[in-house]
Amino acid sequence: MAKQILFDRDAREKLKKGVDALADAVKVTLGPKGRNVILDKKFGSPAITKDGVSVAKDIELKDAIENMGAQLVKEVASKTADQAGDGTTTATVLTQAIFNAGLKNVAAGANPMDLKRGIDKAVSAIIADLKVQSKKISNSNEIAQVATISANNDHEIGKMIAHAMDKVGKDGVITVEEAKGTETEVKTVEGMQFDRGYLSPYFVTNTDKMEVELDRPYILIYDKKVSSMKELLPILEQVVQSGRPLLIIAEDVDGEALATLVVNKIRGALKIAAVKAPGFGDRRKAMLEDIAILTGGTVISEESGYKLENATLEYLGTAEKINIDKDNTTVVNGSGLKDNIVARVNQIKSQMENTTSDYDREKLQERLAKLSGGVAIMYIGAATEVEMKEKKDRVDDALHATRAAVEEGIVPGGGVALIRAGAALDNVAFHNEDEKTGIQIIRTAIESPLRAIVYNAGLEGSVIVQKVKEGTGDYGYNAREDRYEAMIAAGIIDPTKVTRLALENAASVASLLLTTECVVADEPEEKSAMPPMGGGGMGGMM
């Protein structure tokens, strides 16, 4: 395949077109007056979303080099979403602002590497200032405010997330599911989550979410590795006859055993999934015992005199539902006896009192939360499927933002925190004029989120940015109410982690784009013309 190779300004200008195409599509969603984007789907009805990363993921450009620029900005949005769960649109807007300002300076003769050093120094200074501005979340009301902002100013969702966190604690497990009707509600169920995902993606039952969902499954808990199908076959046959799904939790499942399970799952002969046991060493044994007590099963362990080939259905635990993604397994409503669970909880509490190690105490606390905390399920109701998907996206965003806020605290929202942090750039040392220019690029770029919020509200950005810069503390512009006020008192707050990661990831990719001197991509294939059709009729006929 022939390649096209572009250098210097030509390469960067092409990349810029891709960056602008994606960023312009994403930034229409920013702020309280941001608009929706409709995404065409190959199958089913179009999706309507105000979630920046959903828009970014859907964009592919025809030109290969422009598409490279778009894909790199998509990486910023995806990474920010993965790490913080929100802030994807802010990250995209910042990337575009840093890259475009940098591009003008490179075209004017600035050294890209010195610009990058200046940008990196400035970003470090801004992040240090954000940490100083940050304020710990202290009550349920502030949790509701963070969730409300992330859910596009939906107060109902904000209150529900705060309510769910009250029920299961800040470290508890909250899952989002579709409701049968139009009502949205929160329910708490006894449940447990551990940090092990499925052993093979072929076990996935819900391909949209890439999750395994098992209803009323049997749960086989084994403390050794399963490699041979021979030892697993007797219990598998019993499960197949019962017609129920099976989850295998073992030290590992590999080789012939894993291959056979995958083949049976693909053929539809058996609804099955396998995950590795959580923890290591003695903690693994203790956690397997916790799972067994929660689900009413028995840990099949040769130390206790049990062999896998002799196992029957009586040894298996059961639960109402199990959800497994690539990282976590959640067991909902295990069938274990209440008395046994209470006894186990009390045993862990006494171990916590007797231990002298902070590490052990922390791990025991984790086990205690898993056994007694439960899982909160948010059932999202909507009138149509399209509305349901859009609402679920917003709830997911809000949940992630709230967790981020609990983790690292909050800063004033509406783009104010970044503008206030700009003062820290006055003290950043630089070695040459190009580094100074890099610092100046960040000074200008940190205004871009507020400019985009104001633009989406139908107003002129420069005037409002200047007025906000003249203020102090959390004084900013409330685009929803069209007035200037104290952001935190008005409930306009952002998680510190979201703002920090948006800037870090944006600066990282924008700097790489600026220091690009050459781009190599496939030449577009020319479609060959259709061959001429043969003449109709038969030769030689009179």
UniProtKB/Swiss-Prot annotation:
Protein name per UniProt: Chaperonin GroEL
Entry GO terms, CC: cytoplasm
GO terms under biological process: protein refolding
Keywords: ATP-binding, Chaperone, Cytoplasm, Isomerase, Nucleotide-binding
Domain of life: Bacteria
CDD domains tied to this protein: GroEL
Compartments, record wording: Cytoplasm
Function: Together with its co-chaperonin GroES, plays an essential role in assisting protein folding. The GroEL-GroES system forms a nano-cage that allows encapsulation of the non-native substrate proteins and provides a physical environment optimized to promote and accelerate protein folding.
Entries under InterPro entries matching the protein: Chaperonin_Cpn60_CS, Cpn60/GroEL, Cpn60/GroEL/TCP-1, GroEL-like_apical_dom_sf, GROEL-like_equatorial_sf, TCP-1-like_intermed_sf
Organism in which the protein naturally occurs: Cytophaga hutchinsonii (strain ATCC 33406 / DSM 1761 / CIP 103989 / NBRC 15051 / NCIMB 9469 / D465)
Binding site for ATP: 29-32, 50, 86-90, 414, 494
GO molecular function: ATP binding; ATP-dependent protein folding chaperone; isomerase activity; unfolded protein binding
Subunit comment: Forms a cylinder of 14 subunits composed of two heptameric rings stacked back-to-back. Interacts with the co-chaperonin GroES.
Record-linked HAMAP family: CH60
PANTHER family reported in the protein's UniProt record: 60 KDA HEAT SHOCK PROTEIN, MITOCHONDRIAL
Ligase listed as a keyword: no
Gene giving rise to this polypeptide: groEL
Sequence similarity: Belongs to the chaperonin (HSP60) family.
Sections of the chain in a coiled coil: none
Reaction catalysed by this enzyme: ATP + H2O + a folded polypeptide = ADP + phosphate + an unfolded polypeptide
First-tier enzyme category under EC: isomerase
PROSITE patterns: CHAPERONINS_CPN60
Pfam families: Cpn60_TCP1
